[in-house]
Amino acid sequence: MVDEQGSFAVGGTVLVDSLGHTFHGDHAYVFYQKPVGARKYPLVFAHGVGQFSKTWETTPDGREGFQNIFLRRRFSVYLVDQPRRGNAGRGTESVTISPAFDEEVWFNRFRVGIWPDYFEGVQFKRDKETLDQYFRQMTPTIGTTDFEVYSDAYAALFDKIGPGVFITHSQGGPVGWNTLLKTRNIKAIASYEPGGAVPFPEGQLPEEAKFITLSKKMEGIEVPMSVFMEYTKVPIVIYYGDNLPETDERPELYEWTRRLRLMKIWAKMLNDQGGDVTVIHLPEVGLHGNTHFPMSDLNNIEVADLLSEWLHTKALD
């Protein structure tokens, strides 16, 4: 039973023109629900590239997503549209949005299959309506991609609501790493298939972190050792799904293989410094066929169970 729910904007800035007129923008939009008998720490959900809070809501085939699954497990849930996305589309930059005919590209890159064919055993319902819903949950960025703007808003949210657990996905991964540096209220991070801007100590960037992604950016970044050590202060768990090829014949798929390998290196470096980072490749723990969106795949209950178990082992439930 829901005890309280609501929505609000958080973070952002106010521009003022030469005549004193104002423009409020670059804030995040937050929808939250608190169950009766809520557990100690709420879960804050961050979406990835081309997405908004719909990622965590009803799945494309109509089942309950992580929003309801964890609400039923008595966690307060905060679903966020980051600045310049979805319900937080009031960005402070001038921008022109044109249709990009790229849905088949995302079908591949999100590892549903190789267009128009689905992967054998993929945890995705194979019907036209599900695929239609899947494509319609994509939304543009109203401005440039700016991890500082995004993380400022998430940090403002944690400062507002107090201690919680940050659940991130894809591009939300590096946003999470950035946000951790700006607030003391993140008790742990669980990240699904993070990609981009992986922080390594200056002078210790591994070769695996130097590859250029399909977004034409180097996967790793260098930070001072004092910053790197911040990631040893909270437990972190990272999950990757299935259908990760061993060769680069399909670069849009192999990119995720390289990311999994890199995050294992990152985890070891942090753990060697006293950190608590776990990287889980879902097929290795018996979950097969997962796409880039484990939280909405057909086996999302089992995926959620893994997270619940981890939260319990870290005394976060």
Where are these regions (language model features)?
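The feature captures the conserved acid-bearing segment of alpha/beta-hydrolase catalytic domains
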Residues: G196-G274, T278-I280
